[in-house]
Structures are given as structure tokens and as C-alpha cells.
Amino acid sequence: MTENLTVQPERLGVLASHHDNAAVDASSGVEAAAGLGESVAITHGPYCSQFNDTLNVYLTAHNALGSSLHTAGVDLAKSLRIAAKIYSEADEAWRKAIDGLFT
């Protein structure tokens, strides 16, 4: 690779916002399924207990995954914002240093 790497802090901010939204969506997905197992158990009764048990196992895994995705999205968004700030500050520091050489 001979091309220069460029970082656009504004783009990192946009990506951070996308990950914030993904975190909210993951939480919404978990909330949408909340109570489903109990509802099925009530409406279908003990006759479907094996299905209800399987559904509860699925919902437990669904909740864990949703929680993990939410945490990962929030953490990644935070890291992207920190990186954007660091790149901006470094650019500003180098700009001042270079300007100081010519004044």
C-alpha cells in the first residue's frame, strides 16, 4: 500500500451515531419479545409445556445476545468518538507546530 491513510473525524462521528442506533435497535428487539414466553404459557397451557420450555431457552439466548449487541454498540460508538477527538486534537497540534515554524 503506497497510498496515504486519511482519517475524517466527522465520518467517525457518523459511524458512532450508526452504532448508537444499532444499540437502541438491539434493546428494542429484546423489549419486543419480553413476556412472550409467559403469554404463550398462559394461552396454550401445560399441553405445550415442551414448546414453552424451548421458547424460554430461545428467549434467554435472545436477551443475552441483545444485551451483548447493545453493549458492543455503545462501546464502539464511544471508542469512535474518542478516536475522532484524538485525531482532531493531533491535527490541530501539528498545525500549530508547523505554523510556528513559519512565523
Swiss-Prot record:
GO terms for cellular component: extracellular region; peptidoglycan-based cell wall. It is found in: Secreted. Its main location: secreted. Contains multiple, broadly recognized T-cell epitopes and is a major target of cellular immunity in both active and latent tuberculosis infection, indicating this might be a good vaccine candidate. A fusion protein (p846) of 3 well-defined antigens (EspC, EsxH and Rv2660c) induces robust specific T-cell immune response and could be an effective vaccine. Induction: Transcriptionally activated by EspR. Repressed by the MprB/MprA two-component system, by direct regulation and via EspR. Up-regulated by the PhoP/PhoR two-component system, via EspR. Disruption phenotype: Mutant exhibits pathogenesis defects, including reduced virulence in mice, attenuated growth in macrophages and an inability to suppress immunostimulatory cytokines such as IL-12. Host (human) cells no longer produce cytokine IP-10 (CXCL10) upon infection, but continue to produce IL-1 beta (IL1B). GO terms for biological process: biological process involved in interaction with host; protein secretion by the type VII secretion system; symbiont-mediated evasion of host immune response. It holds the Pfam family T7SS_ESX_EspC. InterPro entries: EspC. Keywords: Acetylation, Secreted, Virulence. The modification N-acetylthreonine is found at residue 2. It comes from the Bacteria. Required for ESX-1 function. Required for either stability or expression of EspA. The C-terminal region is required for secretion by the ESX-1 system. Interacts with EccA1 and EspF. Belongs to the EspC family. This is ESX-1 secretion-associated protein EspC. It comes from Mycobacterium tuberculosis (strain ATCC 25618 / H37Rv).
